[in-house]
């Protein structure tokens, strides 16, 4: 479980405090504040050129973990197989089992820089395969999938008519190239549940806020589970997240730079040892 070593930026905290002072302590709509969903849609457009209908294709969840859980529960029938690259986040396997699915593990290899290859994916697909979980950028390996890697995966996904759950919670923490979402490829938005949140990019782990973007037919089923199990994500957190989305780009960039400096500091002795 990733925990940023930064505090939530003050202007984001202030917005949460202000919402309490203004008495905004009631339920929001089940799917989340309209203002927040609008900002999420704008963020995805400016960052990745992806267009989502805030009213029909975006919902706010209690962290990305809830989004993973309800996506699996909404999509799986008993015995459906879910391909899960490992190592990765601890929740994928138990959530699959709880939803009645069967986890199928693909061990990522160091020689492939811990990226999933089309050959590895193809090798584990069966007639029961329904979903591919894409945990990239990856925790704990730090692996990313570049555009060419994703193109090969997309081809296999389409050939076998699979759905994808793309956990992109670390999308802001790449240090060389920008993150590429698998949902941005032609024909993939219609078969992808994109999951993201505020914990890593904005150092908001304790605020417990994430979101899911999906085709309307899938999102409707996810929302049914969410509204009866959760009602809505925390109201105070949602107002703070609006501020994060509107004015948090500089904070994200500063934290990314600090993480990158730490990466350089840790990796430099290893590089020097390899040279010597």
Stretches with model-predicted labels:
Residues 104, 109-178:
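Active-site phosphate-binding strand-loop segment of PLP-dependent enzymes
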């Amino acid at each position: 479980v990733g925990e940023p070593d930064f505090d939530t930026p003050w202007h984001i905290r202030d917005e949460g405090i202000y919402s309490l002072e203004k008495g905004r302590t009631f339920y929001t709509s089940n799917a989340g504040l309209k203002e927040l969903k609008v900002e999420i849609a704008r963020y995805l457009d400016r960052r990745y050129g992806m267009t989502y209908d805030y009213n029909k294709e975006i919902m706010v969840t209690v962290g990305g973990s809830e989004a993973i859980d309800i996506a699996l529960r909404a999509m799986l029938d008993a015995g459906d197989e879910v391909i899960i690259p490992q190592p990765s986040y601890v929740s994928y396997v138990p959530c699959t089992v709880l939803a009645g699915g069967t986890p199928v593990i693909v061990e990522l290899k160091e020689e492939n820089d811990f990226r999933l290859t089309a050959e590895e994916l193809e090798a584990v697909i069966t007639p029961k395969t329904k979903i591919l979980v894409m945990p990239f950028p990856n925790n704990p390996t730090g692996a990313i999938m570049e555009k060419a890697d994703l193109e090969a995966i997309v081809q296999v996904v389409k050939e076998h008519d699979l759905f994808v759950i793309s956990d992109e919670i670390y999308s802001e923490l790449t240090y060389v190239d920008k993150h590429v979402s698998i949902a941005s490829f032609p024909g993939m938005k219609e078969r992808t549940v994109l999951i993201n949140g505020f914990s890593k990019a904005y150092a908001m782990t304790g605020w417990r806020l994430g979101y899911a973007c999906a085709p309307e037919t899938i999102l409707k089923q996810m929302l049914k589970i969410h509204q009866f199990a959760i009602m809505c994500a925390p109201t105070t957190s949602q107002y703070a997240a609006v501020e994060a989305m509107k004015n948090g780009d500089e904070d994200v960039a500063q934290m990314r730079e600090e993480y990158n400096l730490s990466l350089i500091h840790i990796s430099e002795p290893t590089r020097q040892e390899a040279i010597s």
